[in-house]
Structure formats: C-alpha cells, structure tokens
C-alpha cells in the first residue's frame, strides 16, 4: 500500500505507525478497524493488559462516567507520548445518545494533564479525539490552564 493510500485509511488518519500490539476497547461488534493485511501481524487486545505498556490505544466511550473509569488505567498503561484515541458517538448517531462531544466530558483526562489535540471521523456513528500529555504539546502556555488555575467543575 502506498503512503498516499495508507493516509486514506482510519489507521492512517490516526497516525498508526506499525505497533505490534494495540488496544481497541469497547468497539461495536460490527466495527472494522482495518481491511486486508493492515493488521495481519498485530495483536489487537480488546481490554487493557495491566502488565503491558501500549503505544497505541483506541477506546470507545459513550458516557462521561466511562471516561472517568477508563482514563486512569489507560494512562497508566500508555507509553511516554503514546497514541491515545477516545472515540465518542456523534450527535447524529442513530445508535443511541452520549453525554460526550468534542468539547465536553474530558475533564478526567484534562485533570491528568491530557488534552484533545486531533480529531478524525471514524465512521457515520463515531468521531475520535486524540489525547496527548501537555508536556508534549507545543505552545501550551496560552492554550491550557495551569494546574492551579483549573476550575473544579
């Protein structure tokens, strides 16, 4: 597959770099991450192995409470500057409702210094938001509040 073709795939849009073991957690049964041989030699875990440091995670969530419960475990098992994507239902989704959107529901991650940096459309039902540790985000001084300036919401 040429580099141009790869960028058209979901994994390409998510900046997947060939990691040999990844997490795809809480995905719908009919969700397909890749077609063909793209993940042929990759171990895809559907739960986080607490003993393994992951470089690439995709976690589907529908409620803020799920973010609150999953975030600490995901961050504990994420390698330094690993790729962490949270997928949430679009407002136009026909498969149910969510209390999450691009701008709301991510406080549990923000409280641990992770902020949404990139967004991609997964399919007609889901969007994905990449979270990154503030220490790796350039020009952070004006974009994000310092820890002691955050609201208690």
Across the structure, where does each feature detected by a protein language model lie?
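Conserved beta strand-loop-helix elements of the APE1-like EEP
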Residues: 128-136
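Conserved class I S-adenosyl-L-methionine
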Residues: 14, 19-27
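Short, charged/polar "capping" segments at the starts of alpha-helices
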Residues: 29-35, 94-96
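A short glycine-rich, Lys/Arg-flanked "PGG" loop and its adjoining helix->strand segment in the class I
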Residues: 71-80
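Flexible, glycine-/basic-rich loop-and-beta segments that form/coincide
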Residues: 10, 135-153
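Short acidic low-complexity segments
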Residues: 43-54
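Conserved beta-strand signature within the Rossmann-like core of class I S-adenosyl-L-methionine
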Residues: 81-90
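Conserved Class I S-adenosyl-L-methionine
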Residues: 99-119
């Amino acid at each position: 597959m040429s580099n141009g073709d790869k960028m058209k795939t979901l994994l390409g849009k998510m900046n997947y770099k060939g990691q040999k073991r990844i997490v795809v957690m809480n995905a719908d049964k009919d969700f397909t991450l890749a077609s063909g041989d793209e993940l042929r030699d990759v171990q895809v875990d559907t739960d986080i192995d607490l003993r393994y440091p992951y470089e690439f995670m995709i976690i589907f969530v529908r409620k803020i409470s799920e973010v609150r419960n999953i975030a600490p475990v995901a961050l504990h098992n994420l390698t330094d500057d690993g790729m962490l994507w949270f997928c949430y239902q679009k407002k136009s989704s026909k498969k149910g409702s969510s209390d999450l959107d691009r701008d709301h529901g991510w406080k549990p991650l923000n409280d641990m210094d992770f902020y949404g940096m990139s967004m991609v459309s997964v399919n007609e039902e889901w969007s994905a938001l990449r979270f990154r540790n503030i220490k790796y985000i350039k020009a952070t001084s004006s974009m994000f509040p310092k820890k002691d300036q955050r609201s208690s919401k």
